[in-house]
């Protein structure tokens, strides 16, 4: 058991991510076990091993995407696993090329970009794109890579804690001088070449603020 004083000490120093806020909403016990007591477990079942394999693929994919967007080509392999990875990375390269063809150099790519608000809320974007016109920031596009194959529907994407937190933090920081309508978030599933776009409004921003700080 963790005593009340130790619990309060750790809570006061936590920086809250999307996963942490989601865990808190689901179960206070899960949150305390995972983020305060730091209890993690594995049952070594087939399902558990498959989960670890998927997580490993996801980590590799995100790392390779970061390299591509920084202009560092990933190493290619001939294994079946890496052929899937190469295919998925080629689809991310296509997104990069389309932006370059449309906006030229009037944009900047920020892969694995972390923002922390002063009230200890933190997010790390897979990719944040700043789009400029005449040297002035005019739009922000958030991209999140999803390696699972189950199709993400727009209605579900709009209600995800991740969506609401990522868009809120973006508006409160880099996008503070932008209209909400100039901030967008995209979920992209390269394995099935599926993309969902979520737009933003002032009403959504106020709703997200209320949801986040009442969690």
Predicted segment positions?
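Metal-dependent nuclease catalytic cores that hydrolyze phosphodiester bonds in DNA/RNA
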Residues: 1-130
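Short catalytic/ligand-binding loop motif for oxyanion handling, primarily in non-cytosolic enzymes
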Residues: 32-33, 40-41, 150-152, 193-196
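Glycine-rich, flexible loop segments associated with nucleotide phosphate handling
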Residues: 50-55, 137-141, 180-184, 210
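Generic recognition of stable, solvent-exposed alpha-helical segments in well-folded globular domains
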Residues: 56, 60, 158-161, 165, ...
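Active-site catalytic microenvironments for nucleophilic, acid-base chemistry
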Residues: 67-71, 168-173
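Short helix-terminating capping/connector loops at secondary-structure junctions
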Residues: 104-107, 136-137, 176-182
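Non-catalytic protein-protein interaction segments used by genome-maintenance enzymes to assemble
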Residues: 110-163, 171-174
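Metal-dependent nuclease catalytic regions and adjoining charged, substrate-binding loops involved
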Residues: 111, 170-215
